[in-house]
């Protein structure tokens, strides 16, 4: 079974990239979709991602970091020309569904670039008091108007909404162009959801077919996330075809690389 990690970041520490590739090899992860969120998150920037992809073009898929309210549609176009295949969105200056941001979503739809939206509470390692960062701007239901206005746009809810699982699940169920990943730290929101049972939220037939595998952890935790995800699928007797969608088929379809 092919495995592609659809949610990974490149931290700005020595040898992180080589450690990441080694962790991917250990877990039989074929490729990962990688973004750099810059100094605020102790990551490399988009230029650093470009350089990483040049080193490992067959292992890395570039996701350009776009901050709504700071970056523009032209930045998306430039990234597309540079070979980026998808977009990573977080910490907007206004809610995701603000009309001022619609040119971003229109450009992404035109270029057929899937968007991975952070949803829920956000952890920022570097505190900047002048920054007004609000998780309320990143509520999963902020994506509803976007999914309606741009029906050909491919949206991924990161972290299943973190603490807004009810809303994330309903959007997932009701909108054909919305998917989710279950990424996050082992001791974070995933632990709560698994203690209850994720079928509380993914209750309808075919719900698991809209999941995309992603980790969003440091390289040393990737194997743990993968094992937890497989254990969860085993618990609910998820069939092999659905597993193929989760671990590679969905993201490849969204990237139009099937």
Q: Language-model segments: what does each one mean?
A:
Residues 1-9, 15-31, 35, 77-78, ...:
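Mid-to-C-terminal alpha-helical segments outside catalytic/metal-binding sites
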Residues 2-4, 104, 116, 146-149, ...:
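A generic "structured core" feature
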């Amino acid at each position: 079974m092919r495995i592609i990690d659809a949610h990974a970041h490149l931290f700005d520490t020595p040898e992180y990239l080589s450690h990441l590739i080694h962790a991917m090899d250990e877990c039989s992860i074929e490729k990962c979709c990688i973004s750099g969120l810059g100094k605020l998150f102790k990551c490399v920037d988009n230029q650093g991602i470009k350089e990483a992809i040049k080193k490992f073009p067959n292992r890395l898929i570039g996701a350009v970091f776009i901050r709504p309210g700071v970056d523009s549609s032209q930045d998306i176009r430039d990234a597309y020309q540079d070979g980026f295949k998808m977009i990573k969105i977080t910490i907007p200056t206004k809610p995701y569904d603000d009309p001022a941001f619609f040119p971003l979503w229109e450009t992404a739809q035109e270029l057929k670039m899937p968007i991975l939206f952070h949803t829920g509470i956000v952890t920022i390692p570097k505190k900047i008091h002048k920054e007004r960062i609000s998780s309320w701007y990143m509520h999963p239901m902020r994506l509803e108007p976007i999914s309606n206005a741009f029906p050909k746009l491919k949206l991924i809810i990161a972290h299943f909404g973190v603490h807004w699982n009810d809303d994330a699940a309903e959007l997932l169920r009701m909108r054909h162009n919305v998917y989710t990943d279950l990424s996050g730290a082992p001791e974070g929101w995933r632990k709560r959801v698994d203690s209850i049972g994720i079928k509380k939220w993914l209750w309808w037939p075919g719900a698991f077919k809209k999941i995309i595998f992603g980790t969003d952890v440091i390289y040393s935790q990737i194997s743990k996330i993968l094992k937890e995800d497989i254990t969860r699928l085993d618990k609910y007797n998820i069939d092999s075809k659905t597993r193929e969608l989760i671990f590679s088929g969905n993201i490849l379809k969204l990237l139009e690389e099937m």
